[in-house]
C-alpha cells in the first residue's frame, strides 16, 4: 500500500467520523475536540546518550483534532489527528491516535483522566518523523453551552522518534514531556 493511498484512506475515515458527529450532536454523545498542547520537555534519549532539560531547552507544540463518542456516561472513546513540533532535535510529527476518557469522580462530572495511544506517520517529502505516541493525564471540561466548552489538560507525553541522521539509518530517540493543554469542545 502506498503512502499516499494510506494518507487518503485515513483522511476519508476521519472526515466520515466528523460528518457523523455533526448529524448526531442533538444526542450529545458525539464530541469534537480542538486542542493546543505545550510539551515541557523533561528528558530525551538518543542511543545511549540522555539529555535533560538543564542540557537543552526542550519543548514542543501541537494542535490536535479528535472526534469522540460517549459509550457510557463515564467513558468516551475516539480517534484524532494532529500536527506537532518538538524543539531541540527538531522533529515534526503527524500523529494519528486513539483516545480514551474516563470520568471517575461522581461529584466532579467535568473532570476526567485520559490516555492517547497512536503513531506518527512517516513522510520524508513533508518532513514528518515517524514514531509511537503515548499520553496520560487529567483534564477538565467546562461547558458554557450545550455544544461548546473549554477544555484544560495536564499530563505526561512519551514520544519515540525513528529517523536517519548523517550516515546512521534508523536512529531512535525518546522524549519525555509534561503536557499543558487548552482547547475547545464542541
Residue spans of the language-model regions?
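Cleavable N-terminal export/targeting peptides
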Residues: 1-29
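Transmembrane beta-strand segments of Gram-negative outer membrane beta-barrel proteins
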Residues: 26-42
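Residues that define the transmembrane beta-barrel architecture of outer-membrane proteins
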Residues: 28-30, 57-61, 92-96, 128-134, ...
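Repeated loop/turn-to-beta-strand initiation elements of outer-membrane beta-barrel proteins
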Residues: 30, 74-77, 108-111, 144-150
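Membrane-embedded beta-strand positions of outer-membrane beta-barrel proteins
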Residues: 32-36, 65, 77-79, 98-100, ...
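Outer-membrane beta-barrel "beta-signal"
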Residues: 35, 39, 173-186
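Sequence/structural signature of outer-membrane beta-barrel proteins
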Residues: 39-49, 82-89, 118-125, 158-166
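Residue-level signature of outer-membrane beta-barrel architecture
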Residues: 69, 102-104, 140-142, 158, ...
Amino acid at each position: 500500500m502506498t503512502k499516499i493511498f494510506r494518507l487518503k484512506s485515513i483522511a476519508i475515515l476521519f472526515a466520515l467520523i466528523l460528518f457523523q458527529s455533526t448529524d448526531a450532536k442533538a444526542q450529545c454523545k458525539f464530541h469534537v475536540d480542538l486542542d493546543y498542547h505545550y510539551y515541557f520537555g523533561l528528558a530525551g534519549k538518543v542511543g545511549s546518550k540522555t539529555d535533560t532539560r538543564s542540557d537543552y531547552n526542550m519543548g514542543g507544540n501541537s494542535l490536535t483534532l479528535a472526534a469522540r463518542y460517549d459509550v457510557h456516561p463515564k467513558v468516551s472513546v475516539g480517534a484524532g489527528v494532529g500536527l506537532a513540533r518538538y524543539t531541540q532535535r527538531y522533529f515534526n510529527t503527524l500523529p494519528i491516535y486513539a483516545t480514551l476518557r474516563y470520568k471517575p469522580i461522581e461529584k466532579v462530572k467535568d473532570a476526567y483522566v485520559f490516555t492517547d495511544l497512536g503513531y506518527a506517520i512517516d513522510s520524508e517529502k513533508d518532513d514528518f518523523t515517524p514514531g509511537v505516541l503515548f499520553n496520560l493525564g487529567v483534564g477538565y471540561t467546562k461547558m458554557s453551552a450545550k455544544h461548546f466548552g473549554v477544555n484544560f489538560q495536564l499530563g505526561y507525553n512519551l514520544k519515540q522518534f525513528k529517523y536517519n541522521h548523517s550516515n546512521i539509518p534508523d536512529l531512535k530517540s525518546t522524549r519525555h514531556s509534561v503536557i499543558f493543554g487548552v482547547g475547545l469542545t464542541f
